């Protein structure tokens, strides 16, 4: 009998760096800019993607240098993950952290990102490049029902 996959055996804190990185499905949702109301701290979701995001592949074009190139790039870590209530319910970090399994379309289960793109989980069908946007308020999305 084969061993269950690592995400069913370990907590996020117990995962190796490579296991942690492999959980990311590459949907690009983390790379969409959010606006925060300074008075209420409410988060507004936009379809404005960081210029480092390759919208077609939903991959960072400069992953190794992303933090030096984009000062607002957010690094999800085991330590700060609990502060990111805005992560979508499809996010593997959120799912595993809440004790759930990976969705059937996740690349670790399917071997590719095709199913994820087919389910329209990725941002490639809605994202626009940050450098092409004049007024970000024109790009605010309806607040997802799962967003806190």
From Swiss-Prot:
The family database entries (Pfam families) matched by this protein are listed as: CxxCxxCC
Cited InterPro entries: Puta_zinc/iron-chelating_dom (IPR005358), UCP006173 (IPR008228)
**Similarity section:** Belongs to the UPF0260 family.
- Name of this chain's protein: UPF0260 protein YPO2083/y2228/YP_1926
Q: What are the top taxonomic ranks of the organism?
A: Bacteria, Pseudomonadati, Pseudomonadota, Gammaproteobacteria, Enterobacterales
